[in-house]
Amino acid sequence: MSTSSKPRKFTAPKGVPDYVPPNSHEFNAVRSTFHHCATVAGYEPVELPIFEDTSLFARGVGESSDVVTKEMYTFEDRGGRSMTLRPEGTAGVMRAVIEHGLDRGQLPAKLVYAGPCFRYERPQAGRYRQFQQVGVEAIGVDDPALDAEVIALAYRCFTSLGLMGFRLELTSLGDSTCRPAYREKLQAFLTSLPLDEETQHRAQINPLRVLDDKRPEVKEMTADAPLMLDYLSDEARAHFETVTGILDDLSVPYTINPRMVRGLDYYTKTCFEFVHDDLGAQSGIGGGGRYDGLMAELGGRDLSGVGFGLGVERALLALETEKKTVTDGSRVEVYGVAMGEEAHRRMPVIINDLRQSGVRADMSYGHRGLKGSMKAADRAGARFALVIGEDELAKSIVQVKDLHEGEQTAVPLDQVVQEVRGRLSA
């Protein structure tokens, strides 16, 4: 006797989250808030592919970075080409700017993007192997006022979400005239330490990366390492002082962290990160900086740029720790409850009229009965329920029930759209 096995039940891969209602509304709210903050500052949207030539990220992000050496999802396509799911957004934006000649139009080219990125990391709270990033890039002008604009934009985004427990850390990573001397000093210091072989090798390739090492023993050994802020050129120092001065004028609070090292190798001059201490060791919720040599490194003109990226999941986790919620405004406002066959035929017309007037409306399907339909209205998050039965049809009225206050009012059928719109706008 043969037995049939149940079909396999699929689940999302490890570290790859789903966002379903109601959480998807908060997810969209973070993205839309950032997009609004960017567009009012003159940033234009750009849509990019989620995979690119692997060498774009190797050259753009930095071959010695952990992102490139340990975390990228790389595959060979059927044409034998090495492709990589994007681990961050900036390199792809720069490639698009070069390819489509945006660097030869009005500068700075100010762009805003959003979409998934991929890194093979150990999944933990707010950090996933697929994560959503929103960001801005301002390309083509070396102006400290632009650095300050990007930082202030990010700050406004977090405050617009209602976050309060975050802080801004800021530093300068110098420029091409002062970094070589600092690099020599730092390498000499690191060579004198009893570091393991892999870390010593990293110190020779990119000594700044050692300062980003999270291991307690390495952090202790490098506590007295020379700091980039002590080696800034006059130009880099003036740039940094102008940035901080404008932030002071804009009332954007910050602390200077001379030991800050971002996880990507392309940053120069201004470098910043927003952190939320309630998130523990992995406290970053967004960051960015200036990258003056990146476009030339990717085959374009030698133009500067500055940008910022926000991790949507990190922002959601910060909101959760502060016990705050946000919404994207897409929940249903009005829910139709029809009792009886004729009412069920009439309700779609009413719901359609509401939708055409701009009201977010839905109705109960499947003849659930009054109790089940009212529960569905509550679950949908509706403010008002419209109830129609045989008696209401006979009188050409609709019962409008306020689900927040519990009040119910009879409204003429031909006035229901006007009545509901008025109550929603009150």
Swiss-Prot record:
It is found in: Cytoplasm. Its EC number is 6.1.1.21. Its main location: cytoplasm. GO terms for biological process: histidyl-tRNA aminoacylation. Keywords: Aminoacyl-tRNA synthetase, ATP-binding, Cytoplasm, Ligase, Nucleotide-binding, Protein biosynthesis. Disulfide bonds: none annotated. It is an enzyme of class 6 (ligase). One of its GO terms (cellular component) is cytoplasm. Pfam families: HGTP_anticodon (PF03129), tRNA-synt_His (PF13393). One of its GO terms (molecular function) is ATP binding. It catalyses: tRNA(His) + L-histidine + ATP = L-histidyl-tRNA(His) + AMP + diphosphate + H(+). PROSITE patterns: AA_TRNA_LIGASE_II (PS50862). Belongs to the class-II aminoacyl-tRNA synthetase family. Homodimer. This is Histidine--tRNA ligase. It comes from Corynebacterium kroppenstedtii (strain DSM 44385 / JCM 11950 / CIP 105744 / CCUG 35717).
